[in-house]
Amino acid sequence: MKKIEKIKRVKGELRVPSDKSITHRAFILGALASGETLVRKPLISGDTLATLEILKAIRTKVREGKEEVLIEGRNYTFLEPHDVLDAKNSGTTARIMSGVLSTQPFFSVLTGDESLKNRPMLRVVEPLREMGAKIDGREEGNKLPIAIRGGNLKGISYFNKKSSAQVKSALLLAGLRAEGMTEVVEPYLSRDHTERMLKLFGAEVITIPEERGHIVKIKGGQELQGTEVYCPADPSSAAYFAALATLAPEGEIRLKEVLLNPTRDGFYRKLIEMGGDISFENYRELSNEPMADLVVRPVDNLKPVKVSPEEVPTLIDEIPILAVLMAFADGVSEVKGAKELRYKESDRIKAIVTNLRKLGVQVEEFEDGFAIHGTKEIKGGVIETFKDHRIAMAFAVLGLVVEEEVIIDHPECVTVSYPEFWEDILKVVEF
């Protein structure tokens, strides 16, 4: 349990931890490449360590420094693991590594913690089977643990109906070791870090935005070359502080080196649409990814907003903190087309609705989202996080700006993506 009290102001600057999506991919592509890859400023958290441990278990040599990780690439020639591979709480690790393991002519078993064992895997297992991998598991391969025997893959064309970046990434990385061309079609573009990074590692990736959706193609047999990858600050982690500065009584916060990839900046677009005071400075591009410093100041009134299904992929991880902003807005805000939230570390729709109602906010729940009636009368109370890091951090921000005391249960769950969250809050607020 952690007690949260109201702040007087926000101040100073912060470089939140590096982007989780980019860190996972840098570690994995570094292992798949030939030669060495230097990953600068990686996020070291529960999820990314799960990826590193699995790579080590299939005999990747890794040297971990304070601000960098050096990976000796194996050019897709891994060794059969002695033991079960554990993705812990990380869906990204489980799904992308399924694609990598499918290229290997050996047997492996992939599992996860209790939460991950309940998350759907068929979305990645089915296309990998179609490519030729032999995969079995609980509920016909839909739930971890799954057993994989890979090798001899052939390219396929696959319609990725959920626009899942994890599925797309798994298929592209499997496609590099498949015969012919592998093509992924999405109704709308999901986060594109894998495509950008594959190009950084020297692969040719063809992207075609078309009427029937966004198409990504990769030709089998290409070799990745080790390189240097710089990891910018995670926009999902920065979002909590941008929201805090927006709702604070006074002050300003500068958030440094925040990733502004157009497939990931939906939260900031919505914050601007709500009337947020945010400016972007020092814009630049490193390792094929755009970033900038954000300066955020408080505003008195927030306008309500609607999030449509096609906007959801650009802000899926920020919906809990966006919901907190919506609770303070002047009117009714709505999120639709976000059913995917029910299959995250917790059922996030249920978690958002339950906790906001507990604090006196009127909320309507839909199968694929919710509607929030903004109010100035938000009460205190005990937040049930469902051990979900994003729920804990979102409601911590709420607790810092309401009069009554808010208590967060299982505050330690933030270590999944942001181990220093509680310390960082103290750096930028005055009570």
Curated annotation (Swiss-Prot):
Listed pathway(s): Metabolic intermediate biosynthesis; chorismate biosynthesis; chorismate from D-erythrose 4-phosphate and phosphoenolpyruvate: step 6/7
Positions bound to 3-phosphoshikimate: 20-21, 25, 164, 166, 317, 344
One GO cellular component term: cytoplasm
Catalytic activity entry: 3-phosphoshikimate + phosphoenolpyruvate = 5-O-(1-carboxyvinyl)-3-phosphoshikimate + phosphate
Residues in the signal sequence: none
Cited Pfam families: EPSP_synthase
Biological processes, Gene Ontology terms: amino acid biosynthetic process; aromatic amino acid family biosynthetic process; chorismate biosynthetic process
SUPFAM superfamilies: EPT/RTPC-like
Compartment(s): Cytoplasm
Keyword Transferase listed: yes
Keywords, comma-separated and alphabetical: Amino-acid biosynthesis, Aromatic amino acid biosynthesis, Cytoplasm, Transferase
InterPro entries: Enolpyruvate_Tfrase_dom (IPR001986), Enolpyruvate_Tfrase_sf (IPR036968), EPSP_synthase (IPR006264), EPSP_synthase_CS (IPR023193), RNA3'P_cycl/enolpyr_Trfase_a/b (IPR013792)
Residues that bind phosphoenolpyruvate: 20, 91, 119, 166, 348, 390
Highest taxon listed in the record's lineage: Bacteria
Active site: 317
CDD domains listed in its UniProt record: EPSP_synthase
Record EC number: 2.5.1.19
Annotated function: Catalyzes the transfer of the enolpyruvyl moiety of phosphoenolpyruvate (PEP) to the 5-hydroxyl of shikimate-3-phosphate (S3P) to produce enolpyruvyl shikimate-3-phosphate and inorganic phosphate.
Subunit structure and binding partners: Monomer.
Protein's name according to its UniProt entry: 3-phosphoshikimate 1-carboxyvinyltransferase
Native source species: Aquifex aeolicus (strain VF5)
